[in-house]
Amino acid sequence: MHLGVEEPIRECQYNQICTHNSSPMDTPHIKKKKNKRKWQVFPGRNRFYCNGRIMMAKQTGVFYLTMVLILVTSGLFFAFDCPFLASNLTPAIPAIGGVLFVFVMGMLLRASFSDPGVLPRATPEEAADIERQIDANNGPSGPGYRPPPRTREVLINGQTVKLKYCFTCKIFRPPRASHCSLCDNCVDRFDHHCPWVGNCVGRRNYRFFYLFILSLSFLTIFIFAFVITHVILNALRKALALSTAADFEAVQKDPTGLAFLVLSKTALLDILEVVVCFFSVWSIVGLSGFHTYLISSNQTTNEDIKGSWSSKRGKGNYNPYSYGNFITNCCSALCGPLPPSLIDRRGFIQPDTPQPATQTNGTSACPPNQVQSHMCAQDQCIQSTKFVLQAATNPLLHSQPVILGGGPPLQAKTSLGGPCSTMGPPQPSLPSSIPGLSCGGELMALRDSEIHCHHHLHHQHFISPEETPSPPAPLPCATHLGHHVHPAQLFDPVSQDSLHEDSVRGLVKLSSV
């Protein structure tokens, strides 16, 4: 009878169930915690306002300086210059200035408060799948083995483009995407990080950034020109208003005195406006011209600085994204459809789900609820990125099933960090003590692996009975099948992968966070 053997196995499985993180029963005197939104646990270094509707970089000091300069300069112009110009020249001047000011502020806020095109980070399952693919492609590694760089190559309009692997986001970045070190996010069609707008400039806000600097150039030139006009007209008006002949004769004898007499009565605020506009117009107009050149050639600032499509890299190197036409490139950058945001900022975090416990110093223990809740929240904040990569490159390969005995065991993922880097995955075996599995001589060799499997299960804790792997079902013997059966063929790869994934899933999530 094998009942005496089954009882310790069941007892071991029951002991693996951890109840420290089980969901408590609803009681009337305990208030339920309000579910957090996903922006509250966003992994990047960003600031969110208005309950996640506004997304900015963490460094916003220069952005406020931009706001102050625009508001102060425009306010002085509308308060002191526009009344004189409207009464002496035309009322269209303050009207045009007002339209330009509203447009500039609208484009600035739109570029600053928008999602620039942040790419979601890989889920723990995707990160583990990519790690398995990379390890499988690199082959076995020796003590002095140096793995090759993690890149993939795609062909875009006849030009080979490399997709680099991001060790922070655990993804192969799409073409033209880059990781911003300040915001700690991968941004699609990354142009640059602009501190003046307090945000990254990418695919989703580049048009607003360009329209902001272009309209700001017109507004700066407009204010600079009409402030000088106001100063000149006011000086001429006061020079002609000299009433006494004595003053007029004194001024004629001393031309420098005329200038001092006129300028001393000119508003100092007009001079302040002229100075601010004079030093601003050169940088803003130059920046607008540079980005006009980039749009006309369908490049980004990042690509231009690195010289990605420069002819110095070779005669066959060219920009595969350019349409070869100025108008078409401008329409593509400014008039194309705006892609939707790929991150769910205002979604709710679901209640905590059970997570496998980690191993520390050879003993198993359930992690604290606070750490587990934060891990679960960040896991739900990260969305799938496979559809993003499929749009830019070939589909991601699925992990190959591991068949026991058919090849070398799966190695531990050293690049993920955490407990998974030191603990190899368990190798499930056929428990020969279960009835019906001790009739073949070929199965006797599996008893050693059975002991290893039970020893590994004894050091694991599963949070809920649903995640506890059930004992393997009785399998037919080789003698009953009537022909020789290799032990590797008695296992279903799916069941073996499920046992491995159940025991490692929580560890991968901890290491990926």
UniProtKB/Swiss-Prot annotation:
InterPro entries given in the database record: Palmitoyltrfase_DHHC (IPR001594), PFA4/ZDH16/20/ERF2-like (IPR039859)
Subcellular location: Endoplasmic reticulum membrane; Golgi apparatus membrane
Biased composition (Polar residues): 355-369
Topology class, membrane: Multi-pass membrane protein
Segments forming domain DHHC: 164-214
Pfam families given in the database record: DHHC (PF01529)
Side of membrane Lumenal, spans: 81-88, 229-266
Known catalytic reactions: L-cysteinyl-[protein] + hexadecanoyl-CoA = S-hexadecanoyl-L-cysteinyl-[protein] + CoA
GO MF terms held by the record: protein-cysteine S-palmitoyltransferase activity
Keyword Phosphoprotein: yes
One example of a Gene Ontology biological process annotation: peptidyl-L-cysteine S-palmitoylation
Recorded GO CC terms: endoplasmic reticulum membrane; Golgi membrane
Enzyme class: transferase
Active site: C194
Chief site of localization: endoplasmic reticulum
Domain remark from Swiss-Prot or TrEMBL: The DHHC domain is required for palmitoyltransferase activity.
Name of the protein: Palmitoyltransferase ZDHHC14
The gene coding this protein: zdhhc14
